[in-house]
Amino acid sequence: MAYRVLGRAGPPQPRRARRLLFAFTLSLSCTYLCYSFLCCCDGLGQSRLLGAPRCLRGPSASGQKLLAKSRPCDPPGPTPSEPSAPSAPAAAAPAPRLSGSNHSGSPKPGTKRLPQALIVGVKKGGTRAVLEFIRVHPDVRALGTEPHFFDRNYGRGLDWYRSLMPRTLETQITLEKTPSYFVTQEAPRRIFNMSRDTKLIVVVRNPVTRAISDYTQTLSKKPDIPTFEGLSFRNRSLGLVDVSWNAIRIGMYALHLESWLRYFPLAQIHFVSGERLITDPAGEMGRIQDFLGIKRFITDKHFYFNKTKGFPCLKKPESTLLPRCLGKSKGRTHVQIDPEVIDQLREFYRPYNIKFYETVGQDFRWE
């Protein structure tokens, strides 16, 4: 046997010692081979990273932490030929950004609803002021622009109309303003078909000063139009007023109101005095809040009188630097009108005003 041949060079070794030597030699050889293999793989990996950067994608749930530490790079984003990265498991996925969501990514509270209240008129009566004032109330959300749905855009449908509205909570009122509704023949029926419970707000003003204000606004946009006197009369010497001119026709409030009373009871229509809105804004807004069935949140503390513009403005909120006042287009200086023309128009409007007072049960004292 071999140990006898080897044993010639020295005394024989015990069997146990030979086994330990064999095991140690084998272990040392395996360790060397493994180390060489790992070094080789590491070198190949480094060369691949230097040649073409690649990123690990789509880690499994069990390996996310490990890959997060060893991930070689962050991709700039998928190319047109490259599929998007798969979404993370549902439990770890962030909430999707929805249309109309806030900056934090969570959906805005509330629902878009059809308006429960409308400011339907009248043009140049003070409707913008009422809208801006009532928007201060926490229980009212109002559309800032005039959608003209019931006069110009009715064919777009109620779903389109609803999509324009601000989101509201169950306890809030949705409101919009379009002054031309009051003189639109089809508007009362269309609003009734939307909801017979709709509350209507009408801001009225002395029809003569309203017509002059209307003309002043038009003149600022079209300086070449005829004079106010020329547009107001078909024959001034005979005192024949041209009721086809819209600035005159709008002020015939009793005539337009008849169309509304065919569909809505007087209790659902609230009339605001444009004159009192200037002299006592808190009082007029208090009555509007009562009509809408909401708390009297807007009071005297919310207003101050702007002497330059000649009407009240909202006091500045704590979060802003400047007071909230209507824009430059509001509070224009009216054009000078011949006093005789004003007297003729007052006489023309007198029977309409009296009938209007009797119908609504209020005396606006325009005579």
Curated annotation (Swiss-Prot):
The lineage's top-level taxon is Eukaryota
Enzyme class of the recorded protein, top EC level:
transferase
* Alphabetic keyword roster: Disulfide bond, Glycoprotein, Golgi apparatus, Membrane, Signal-anchor, Transferase, Transmembrane, Transmembrane helix
Membrane topology, as annotated: Single-pass type II membrane protein
The record's catalysed reaction(s) read:
alpha-D-glucosaminyl-[heparan sulfate](n) + 3'-phosphoadenylyl sulfate = 3-sulfo-alpha-D-glucosaminyl-[heparan sulfate](n) + adenosine 3',5'-bisphosphate + H(+)
Q: What does this protein do?
A: Sulfotransferase that utilizes 3'-phospho-5'-adenylyl sulfate (PAPS) to catalyze the transfer of a sulfo group to an N-unsubstituted glucosamine linked to a 2-O-sulfo iduronic acid unit on heparan sulfate. Catalyzes the O-sulfation of glucosamine in GlcA2S-GlcNS. Unlike HS3ST1/3-OST-1, does not convert non-anticoagulant heparan sulfate to anticoagulant heparan sulfate. May contribute to the pineal circadian physiology.
Protein name, entry field: Heparan sulfate glucosamine 3-O-sulfotransferase 2
Q: Which GO terms describe its biological process?
A: circadian rhythm; glycosaminoglycan biosynthetic process; heparan sulfate proteoglycan biosynthetic process
Residue ranges, Cytoplasmic side? 1-19
Molecular function terms, GO-annotated? [heparan sulfate]-glucosamine 3-sulfotransferase activity
Q: Does the keyword Protein transport apply?
A: no
List the transmembrane segments.
20-39
Query: What segment(s) does the record annotate as region Disordered?
Result: 66-115
Q: Family assignment?
A: Belongs to the sulfotransferase 1 family.
Q: Do the record's keywords include Glycoprotein?
A: yes
